Protein backbone atom coordinates (compact mmCIF):
# COMPACT_ATOMS: atom_id res chain seq x y z
CA UNK A 1 0.00 0.00 0.00
CA UNK A 2 0.96 3.59 -0.64
CA UNK A 3 0.01 4.88 2.78
CA UNK A 4 -1.17 4.17 6.29
CA UNK A 5 -4.14 1.81 6.59
CA UNK A 6 -6.10 1.33 9.78
CA UNK A 7 -9.06 -0.44 11.37
CA UNK A 8 -10.71 0.95 14.46
CA UNK A 9 -13.23 -1.37 16.10
CA UNK A 10 -16.26 0.46 17.46
CA UNK A 11 -19.34 -0.93 19.17
CA UNK A 12 -21.52 -0.90 16.07
CA UNK A 13 -19.00 -0.98 13.22
CA UNK A 14 -15.37 -1.07 12.24
CA UNK A 15 -13.93 2.20 11.00
CA UNK A 16 -11.50 1.52 8.19
CA UNK A 17 -9.26 4.12 6.64
CA UNK A 18 -6.39 4.68 4.29
CA UNK A 19 -4.21 7.77 4.60
CA UNK A 20 -2.28 8.34 1.38
CA UNK A 21 -0.75 11.11 -0.66
CA UNK A 22 -1.93 11.88 -4.18
CA UNK A 23 1.74 12.44 -5.01
CA UNK A 24 2.15 8.66 -5.00
CA UNK A 25 -1.25 7.16 -5.89
CA UNK A 26 -4.53 8.34 -7.43
CA UNK A 27 -7.93 7.99 -5.76
CA UNK A 28 -9.07 5.09 -7.96
CA UNK A 29 -5.96 3.01 -7.25
CA UNK A 30 -6.18 3.88 -3.56
CA UNK A 31 -9.68 2.38 -3.45
CA UNK A 32 -8.34 -0.77 -5.12
CA UNK A 33 -5.58 -0.89 -2.47
CA UNK A 34 -8.15 -0.48 0.29
CA UNK A 35 -10.40 -3.25 -1.04
CA UNK A 36 -7.40 -5.54 -1.48
CA UNK A 37 -6.23 -4.87 2.06
CA UNK A 38 -9.63 -5.45 3.67
CA UNK A 39 -10.20 -8.48 1.43
CA UNK A 40 -13.78 -7.40 0.81
CA UNK A 41 -15.75 -5.17 -1.50
CA UNK A 42 -16.47 -1.75 -0.09
CA UNK A 43 -20.21 -1.73 0.70
CA UNK A 44 -20.62 1.98 1.32
CA UNK A 45 -19.02 4.64 -0.77
CA UNK A 46 -15.83 5.71 1.00
CA UNK A 47 -15.67 9.30 2.14
CA UNK A 48 -12.74 10.88 0.37
CA UNK A 49 -11.34 13.64 2.56
CA UNK A 50 -8.71 15.82 0.95
CA UNK A 51 -6.80 18.10 3.24
CA UNK A 52 -3.55 19.89 3.66
CA UNK A 53 -2.27 19.50 7.23
CA UNK A 54 -2.31 22.91 8.87
CA UNK A 55 -2.67 24.64 12.22
CA UNK A 56 -3.78 28.16 13.10
CA UNK A 57 -1.04 30.39 14.43
CA UNK A 58 -3.37 31.88 17.06
CA UNK A 59 -6.28 29.81 18.37
CA UNK A 60 -7.35 32.62 20.70
CA UNK A 61 -7.80 36.03 19.08
CA UNK A 62 -9.67 38.80 20.89
CA UNK A 63 -12.94 37.25 22.10
CA UNK A 64 -12.87 34.24 19.74
CA UNK A 65 -11.31 30.89 20.63
CA UNK A 66 -11.19 27.99 18.20
CA UNK A 67 -11.50 24.54 19.71
CA UNK A 68 -10.38 21.12 18.46
CA UNK A 69 -10.33 20.64 14.70
CA UNK A 70 -11.06 24.34 14.22
CA UNK A 71 -7.50 24.97 15.43
CA UNK A 72 -5.92 22.62 12.94
CA UNK A 73 -6.13 19.28 11.19
CA UNK A 74 -3.07 17.04 11.15
CA UNK A 75 -4.51 13.56 10.60
CA UNK A 76 -7.90 11.85 10.39
CA UNK A 77 -7.67 9.65 13.49
CA UNK A 78 -10.56 10.47 15.78
CA UNK A 79 -8.57 9.95 18.98
CA UNK A 80 -6.22 12.84 18.18
CA UNK A 81 -9.15 15.10 17.31
CA UNK A 82 -10.99 14.22 20.52
CA UNK A 83 -7.86 14.81 22.57
CA UNK A 84 -7.40 18.26 21.01
CA UNK A 85 -11.00 19.20 21.87
CA UNK A 86 -10.66 18.13 25.51
CA UNK A 87 -7.17 19.59 25.93
CA UNK A 88 -8.01 22.95 24.37
CA UNK A 89 -11.16 23.37 26.50
CA UNK A 90 -9.29 22.37 29.68
CA UNK A 91 -6.45 24.76 28.89
CA UNK A 92 -8.87 27.59 28.07
CA UNK A 93 -10.65 27.20 31.41
CA UNK A 94 -7.30 27.21 33.26
CA UNK A 95 -6.16 30.32 31.40
CA UNK A 96 -9.39 32.18 32.11
CA UNK A 97 -9.36 31.24 35.80
CA UNK A 98 -5.71 32.29 36.18
CA UNK A 99 -6.14 35.44 34.11
CA UNK A 100 -3.52 34.25 31.62
CA UNK A 101 -3.33 36.22 28.36
CA UNK A 102 -4.33 34.70 25.02
CA UNK A 103 -0.63 34.61 24.14
CA UNK A 104 -0.04 31.92 26.80
CA UNK A 105 -2.90 29.81 25.44
CA UNK A 106 -1.68 30.23 21.86
CA UNK A 107 1.91 29.33 22.77
CA UNK A 108 0.82 26.15 24.56
CA UNK A 109 -1.57 25.08 21.80
CA UNK A 110 1.13 25.66 19.18
CA UNK A 111 3.46 23.35 21.12
CA UNK A 112 0.79 20.67 21.49
CA UNK A 113 -0.03 20.78 17.76
CA UNK A 114 3.68 20.66 16.86
CA UNK A 115 4.25 17.67 19.15
CA UNK A 116 1.21 15.90 17.71
CA UNK A 117 2.42 16.52 14.17
CA UNK A 118 5.96 15.33 14.97
CA UNK A 119 4.74 12.19 16.67
CA UNK A 120 2.56 11.23 13.71
CA UNK A 121 5.34 12.04 11.24
CA UNK A 122 7.73 9.79 13.16
CA UNK A 123 5.40 6.83 12.66
CA UNK A 124 5.94 7.23 8.94
CA UNK A 125 9.66 7.95 9.19
CA UNK A 126 10.44 5.01 11.48
CA UNK A 127 8.37 2.43 9.64
CA UNK A 128 10.35 -0.51 8.29
CA UNK A 129 8.32 -0.40 5.08
CA UNK A 130 10.00 0.51 1.82
CA UNK A 131 7.83 -1.34 -0.70
CA UNK A 132 6.38 1.76 -2.40
CA UNK A 133 7.52 5.28 -3.30
CA UNK A 134 5.32 6.60 -0.49
CA UNK A 135 7.30 4.76 2.18
CA UNK A 136 10.66 5.36 0.51
CA UNK A 137 9.92 9.10 0.58
CA UNK A 138 9.84 9.07 4.40
CA UNK A 139 13.13 7.16 4.60
CA UNK A 140 14.87 10.37 3.47
CA UNK A 141 14.31 11.91 6.90
CA UNK A 142 16.53 11.04 9.85
CA UNK A 143 14.19 10.28 12.71
CA UNK A 144 16.73 8.81 15.09
CA UNK A 145 18.01 12.11 16.45
CA UNK A 146 14.60 13.72 16.73
CA UNK A 147 13.10 10.77 18.62
CA UNK A 148 15.86 10.94 21.22
CA UNK A 149 15.67 14.74 21.34
CA UNK A 150 11.96 14.53 22.14
CA UNK A 151 12.58 11.76 24.68
CA UNK A 152 15.18 13.93 26.42
CA UNK A 153 12.88 16.95 26.90
CA UNK A 154 11.82 16.94 30.53
CA UNK A 155 8.94 19.29 29.73
CA UNK A 156 7.28 16.47 27.81
CA UNK A 157 6.58 14.70 31.07
CA UNK A 158 3.75 17.07 31.98
CA UNK A 159 2.86 19.36 29.12
CA UNK A 160 1.47 17.34 26.27
CA UNK A 161 -0.18 14.28 24.80
CA UNK A 162 3.17 12.62 24.16
CA UNK A 163 5.22 12.48 27.37
CA UNK A 164 8.88 11.51 27.25
CA UNK A 165 8.04 7.86 27.98
CA UNK A 166 5.99 7.65 24.78
CA UNK A 167 8.95 8.90 22.72
CA UNK A 168 11.15 6.30 24.41
CA UNK A 169 8.67 3.57 23.50
CA UNK A 170 8.53 4.83 19.93
CA UNK A 171 12.33 4.64 19.69
CA UNK A 172 12.37 1.13 21.17
CA UNK A 173 9.48 -0.14 19.06
CA UNK A 174 11.07 1.02 15.84
CA UNK A 175 14.57 0.13 17.10
CA UNK A 176 15.88 3.66 16.69
CA UNK A 177 19.53 3.60 17.79
CA UNK A 178 20.65 6.28 20.21
CA UNK A 179 22.70 8.89 18.28
Named regions from a protein language model:
Residues 1-51, 72-83:
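Conserved FAD/dinucleotide-binding core of flavoprotein oxidoreductases
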Residues 2, 7, 12, 26, ...:
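Detector for Asparagine
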Residues 4, 60, 64, 73, ...:
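Tryptophan-centric aromatic hotspots in well-structured domains and transmembrane helices
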Residues 27, 36, 84-90, 125, ...:
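Solvent-exposed, non-transmembrane amphipathic alpha-helical segments
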Residues 54-117:
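Conserved mid-domain beta->alpha element of the FAD-binding
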Residues 94, 98-179:
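Long, low-complexity C-terminal extensions of enzymes
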Amino acid sequence: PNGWQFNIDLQNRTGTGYVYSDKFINDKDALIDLESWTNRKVITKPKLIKWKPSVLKNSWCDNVVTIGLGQGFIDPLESNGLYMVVYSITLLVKCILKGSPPKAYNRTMSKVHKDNSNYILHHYMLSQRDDTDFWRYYKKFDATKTVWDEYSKKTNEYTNLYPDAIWGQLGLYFDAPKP
